[in-house]
Amino acid sequence: MANILRKVIENDKGEIRKLEKIAKKVEAYADEMEALTDQELQAKTPEFKKRYQAGETLEDLLPEAFAVVREASRRVLGLYPYRVQIMGGVVLHNGDVPEMRTGEGKTLTATMPVYLNALAGEGVHVITVNEYLSTRDATEMGEVYSWLGLSVGINLAAKSPAEKREAYLCDITYSTNSEVGFDYLRDNMVVRQEDMVQRPLNFALVDEVDSVLIDEARTPLIVSGAVSSETNQLYVRADMFVKTLKEDDYIIDVPTKTIGLSDLGIDKAESYFNLNNLYDIDNVALTHFIDNALRANYIMLLDIDYVVSEDGEILIVDQFTGRTMEGRRFSDGLHQAIEAKEGVRIQEESKTSASITYQNMFRMYKKLAGMTGTAKTEEEEFREVYNMRIIPIPTNKPVARLDHTDLLYPTLASKFRAVIADVKARHEKGQPVLVGTVAVETSDYISKQLVAAGVPHEVLNAKNHFKEAQIIMNAGQRGAVTIATNMAGRGTDIKLGEGVRELGGLCVIGTERHESRRIDNQLRGRAGRQGDPGESQFYLSLEDDLMRRFGSDRIKAFLDRMRLEEEDAVIKSGMLARQVESAQKRVEGNNYDTRKQVLQYDDVMREQREIIYANRRDVITANRDLGPEIKAMIKRTIKRTVDAHARSNRNDAIDAIVAFARTNIVPEESISAKDLRSLKDDQIKEELYKRALAIYESQISKLHDQEAVLEFQKVLILMIVDNKWTEHIDALDQLRNSVGLRGYAQNNPVVEYQSEGFKMFQDMIGAIEFDVTRTMMKAQIHEQERERVSPNARTTAAQNIAAQSNQSSESSTQDYSHVKRNDLCPCGSGKKFKNCHGRKAF
C-alpha cells in the first residue's frame, strides 16, 4: 500500500514539473505582450486563427495564446493569472480536471484554455450549475473575450429558439448543464433543420465538474408530454390506504431506502380494496400505486427530499446542493403519489419523448474538461467513465486553515446544543461563522435555536436560493452567521471583512458528515481561501443518518467501553475519525457501483439513441429526394412478411400474404390468392414490390413539385420515427424494471437488458418501416394550392394521413385462425401474433 501511495505522489509531482515547464514558456512572453499596444494585442486573435488554419496546432499556439489572455486580463479586469493558474489552464486544455482549492481563481484560469480552443471556430461551451453563475461569468470574463475579438453568448432557459441559436453560434457559449442537455434533446425532436439551435458538440469546460458529472450523473434529463389520465383518484385511494398502516404492516430497508408491504400489510390491502389476491396479474397497476404511496409516505421526507412551494407545487430538493430543482419531477408516478400525500393538486402523468443522462450527454463532446476544488476522491470514476485525469494544482499561498478533530455526541439534542453554544461564542467575539447542514429541516431547526439564543443570522437553503450569492458574499464579514444547506452558494467566494483575519478568519461548522468526503471537503474549503486564516469543526451524533446507516455499531461499542453516560458528554478521537471515513468510503463505493450500473443500462439506450438521432438528422438536413430510402423500407417490409410465412402451409401462407397486401399496400380488390399461388417466394416479393412502386409513384404525382414531395417525405418519416421511438423508450423503461428480478434466477440483469433491448430495437426498426410503408401506400393525398403552410399545419396534415391509414387498416377484418401465438403477425408489423392482432385472442 505504501508503494502504491508513493507511486501516486511521484506521478503527481512529475505532472506538476511538466506543467511548470509549460507555464514558464507562457511567462517568457510576458514582456513581449506588455510592450504591445492594445490594437497590436487584439490583432493577435486573427493572427492565431490564420496560423491554425495554415496547419499549426492549438498546442503550438498555446504558450503565446495563453500569454495574450494573461495580458488582456490585466488590462481589462486588472487581474493577472498566477503561474498555478496557467498550470490549471494547461490541464483544462488537455481535457483533464485541475483540482484547485476554493479561492484559487478557477474562473480566471478558464479564460486561457477557453480562448485557445475558441480559435478553432467550432465553439466552446462553458458549463455552470446555475444561470446566476452563467450570467455572472459570461458578463465578467466576456469582457476579456470581447476585447480580444471573440463573440460570447449566454444560453438561458427563457430564451427563444432564435436567441438560443444565436448564443450557440458564438465563439464561446455560457450555459447550465441542464439547458445544454435539453437543447440537445429538443434539437433531435424538431421537424425542420432551421428549428435546431446547437452546432456539433466540440469542447465543454464544466465548472464544479464533480457536481455535474458525479453527483448528478444518475439524473436523467427527460423531455416528456402529458398523457391524459383518469388515475388521480387511484393515487388518492392508495394514499388513504397507506396512511392507515402501522409499522408492522410494511418493511423498510434503511441502507437501500426501499419499502414493501409485510404479510400483514398485504392482508390489509386485500381487505381494503376487496381483492382475493393483491399480486394477481390483474392488479399490477394497483400494486404500482400502492408501492409509490408507500415510498411517498415513509421514504420521501418533506424538507429533505422535497419542499411544498407557496402555490402548492412539490419541488424536488437536490441532495447535493440543497437547491430546489425547478421544473423537475420524480418519475414513474412517485411525484403524483407525493402530491396525494401532501394534499395538493395532482398533476397529470407524462410520457417520455426523449431522455439522456449527464454521463452520456457530456461524453458526446469531442473534448471535455472540468474544474473543481474537490475531485481526487472520485479519481477512479473520472478516469473510467470520462477518460479524465485529476491533477492537483498547488495553491498560490500555503493553506492556513485549522481543521479541528470531529466531536461526537450521544444524541442529536446534545450535538445541537453544542453547535449553538459554539456559534454564539464565536459571534460574540466577532468571528464570522458558516454553519453547513445536510437538509433544509436542519437549517430551519438551527435557525430557530439561534433566534432563541439571540444570535442574528442569515439562512440559505432550497427555499430562498435566489439571494444565495449576496448572502454568501457577506458571510465573511465581522460577526456574520450564515446557515447553508450543503454547498448552496457554491461558486461564489467568501471574502473576509475588515479585522476578521485577526479573529481567526471564517469558521466553518459542519452539523453532520455527508455521505461523500468530497462534499465535506467542499464545506471545509469555504474557509482559508488564498492563504487566509480559517477554522473548520464538524459536530457528529450517534443519531446522525450516516452513523445510523453505516457506522454506529462499532462506534457504539467503542463508546460503551469509554462508559459514556452523560448526554452532553463529548468524544474527540482519531479512531472515531477513521471509522467515519470508513463509513463514507463504503457509501461512496456503493454510490459509484450504482452509477456504473446506471451507465451500463444507459449505454444500451445511448447506442440506440445515436442511431435514431443520426438517421433523423440525415432526414431533416436532406436536400435530396428521399424516395430511395422509402422504397427500401417498402422492400424490406414486403421481404419480412413473405419470409415470415415461408415455413407455413402454402395455402395459409398465400392467404396471409394477400391479407397483408390488401390491408397495407394495394387496393383491396386488386389482388387475390390466385395471382400469387403459382409464384415462388422471391417472385411474390418482386410482384408485390412492383405493385407497391406503381402506387408510390401515383401517390407522389399528386404533389405539385419536388419541394412539396420532400416536405411530405420528411414529415412522414419523422412523425413515425418519433412516435415509435417514444413507445420504445417506454418499453425499455418497463424492461429495465422487470430484468432486475432475473438476478434471482442467476441471470445477469444487465446482459439480459442488453440482449432484449437489442431485439426490441430491431422490432422497432421493423415497425417504423412497416408504418412508413402502410402510410405511404394507403394515405389519401390531395393536391393543394401552391402556398407555404405553417410547420404546425404540416405536422397536423401528416398526423391526419396516419390516422386515415390506421383507420383503413383496422377496418379490414381478416381471418387469423390459422396463425399460432408465437408466429410473426401476418400484418407485417414485425411483432409476434400474440403481441399484435392476436392480443385479444390470447
Curated annotation (Swiss-Prot):
Q: Where does Zn(2+) bind?
A: 825, 827, 836-837
Q: Name one GO cellular component term.
A: cytosol
One function term, GO molecular function aspect: protein-exporting ATPase activity
- Can you tell me which residues bind ATP? 85, 103-107, 493
Q: Which family does it belong to?
A: Belongs to the SecA family.
Subunit (UniProt)? Monomer and homodimer. Part of the essential Sec protein translocation apparatus which comprises SecA, SecYEG and auxiliary proteins SecDF. Other proteins may also be involved.
The entry's protein name is Protein translocase subunit SecA
- What is the protein's species of origin? Streptococcus uberis (strain ATCC BAA-854 / 0140J)
Tell me the classification of the organism that encodes this protein.
Bacteria, Bacillati, Bacillota, Bacilli, Lactobacillales
